[in-house]
């Protein structure tokens, strides 16, 4: 088999739409009968996934793999940085934790990871027809270029043609694209095969004079003006938009606590699709109100975020509502917070030895350590309101939690998972709503508590909904992007 062709998507800045454009290209190539795979040498994200091999990777490449119809593979994201503070991150290489590093230390040493990057890429290139590569931030960060392993530095390593994307929705797209091109070296500019304007609203004819001038000044073709597509596909860069209070006019109200180090917000995305369940994020006690359900999400720093809950008044508000019977569900770090104590005597979670009082809503005790559990799991929910719901989920957490009382679920071998006490539920299972079984059971229970008839709520299975959204994305991008030019840039004929 010949080595895979490739196309790389770089952006003028973070949030330009690289991730979704890569997902669209993965879908388009798959629709065209090609074996496409995504690749991002280094991703910085709080949202991660566990592969079937028990290895950790960024969710952006998981989404792109799903769009391509292939199994997520850690080779698609050999380096993952998970911020744990304003100046440091957990460094994960080939799915395994290498340790904590300050930003300055990582910057000095990251070139040593090039062999890991190239081994992952070369291995994928032997199996795939096309590799869709995503850059990070901007290739024109002139203070970082000398150590670049994710933008033009990577493009040179793998000899990738590049599409440069700018976001017109924020304004200034012509300056973004022109300025980025001007700050690149001549050999880097030569790699750019086309400019793409993303998130356009309105009549493209109005843009024509600007496009012509941009092409004249950069000597590069504009190969697409992609409209602002209303698709519901998880995207790390759109988290800030998702965190804005969503809710809507639905009869049921679910409030997610907006923790400072919130991670894996994707756990709750399936709930947003339920026709009766409004989902919103809250950052203070005033916003909390009186919801039908309170959700405590995962976090990259359980200890600091628990202290934040205390300081901002959300702990007091949550405890009052829980005492009145409001259901509370904690996932991963949120589950740990719900317990009696959190023992970080080694300082592995917060960076300083301490033991904290938990929220006291579950009979559990958590002891943190350096060891991280990573696994894909199957389980059956045993908690009374949702008993029988079958889950396919994954675990990523440090710390061991000892629980008394009833479990939330059981593994196939009979082992217990999570904890339940009255109206409070805790679990380590990420992706617990993806199959739809628990979503249906949870919404049905909440409806019965409120006297609402849930029978008219037709819920599309998450897998089918995701497929529809990928196809919608691909259709929109295919119609707007010159795919002949994209195939030509890769040295391929259009399929």
Which stretches of residues belong to each language-model region?
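Flexible phosphate-sensing "switch/lid" loops adjacent to ATP/NTP-binding sites
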Residues: 1-320, 327, 344-347, 370-371, ...
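Conserved P-loop NTPase catalytic core
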Residues: 348-375
């Amino acid at each position: 088999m010949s080595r895979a062709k490739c196309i790389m998507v770089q952006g003028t800045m973070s949030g330009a739409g690289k991730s979704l454009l890569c997902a669209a290209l993965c879908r388009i190539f798959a629709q065209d009968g090609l074996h496409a795979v995504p690749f991002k040498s280094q991703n910085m994200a709080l949202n991660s996934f566990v592969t079937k091999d028990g290895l950790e990777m960024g969710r952006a490449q998981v989404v792109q793999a799903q769009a391509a119809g292939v199994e997520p593979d850690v080779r698609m994201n050999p380096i993952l940085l998970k911020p744990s503070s304003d100046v440091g991150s957990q460094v994960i290489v080939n799915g395994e934790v290498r340790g904590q590093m300050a930003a300055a230390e990582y910057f000095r040493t990251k070139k040593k990871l090039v062999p890991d990057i190239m081994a992952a890429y070369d291995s994928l290139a032997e199996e795939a027809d096309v590799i869709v590569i995503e850059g990070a931030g901007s290739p024109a960060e002139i203070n970082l270029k000398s150590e670049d392993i994710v933008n033009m530095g990577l493009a040179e390593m793998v000899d990738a043609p590049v599409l440069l994307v700018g976001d017109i929705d924020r304004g200034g797209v012509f300056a973004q694209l022109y300025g980025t091109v001007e700050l690149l070296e001549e050999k880097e500019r030569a790699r750019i095969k086309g400019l793409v304007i993303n998130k356009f609203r309105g009549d493209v004819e109005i843009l024509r004079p600007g496009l012509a001038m941009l092409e004249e000044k950069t000597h590069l073709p504009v190969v697409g003006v992609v409209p602002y597509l209303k698709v519901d596909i998880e995207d790390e860069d759109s988290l800030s938009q998702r965190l804005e209070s969503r809710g809507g006019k639905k009869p049921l109200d679910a409030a997610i606590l907006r923790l400072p180090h919130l991670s894996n917000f994707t756990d709750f995305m399936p709930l947003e699709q339920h026709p009766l369940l409004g989902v919103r994020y809250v950052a203070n006690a005033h916003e909390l109100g009186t919801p039908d359900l309170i959700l405590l999400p995962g976090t990259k720093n359980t200890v600091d975020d628990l202290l934040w809950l205390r300081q901002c008044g959300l702990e007091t508000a949550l405890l009052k509502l829980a005492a009145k019977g409001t259901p509370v569900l904690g996932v991963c770090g949120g589950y740990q917070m719900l317990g009696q104590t959190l023992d970080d005597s080694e300082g592995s979670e917060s960076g300083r030895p301490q033991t904290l009082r938990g929220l006291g809503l579950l009979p559990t005790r958590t002891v943190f350590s350096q060891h991280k559990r990573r696994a894909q799991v199957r389980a059956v929910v045993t908690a009374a309101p949702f008993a029988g719901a079958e889950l396919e989920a994954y675990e990523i957490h440090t710390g061991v939690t000892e629980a008394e009382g009833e479990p939330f679920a059981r593994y196939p071998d009979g082992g217990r998972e999570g904890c339940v006490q009255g109206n409070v539920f805790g679990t380590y299972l990420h992706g617990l709503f993806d199959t739809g079984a628990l979503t249906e059971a949870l919404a049905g229970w909440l409806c019965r508590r409120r006297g609402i008839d849930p029978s008219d709520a037709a819920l599309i299975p998450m897998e089918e909904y995701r497929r529809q959204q990928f196809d919608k994305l691909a259709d929109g991008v295919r119609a707007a992007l010159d795919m002949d030019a994209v195939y030509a840039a890769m040295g391929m004929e259009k399929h």
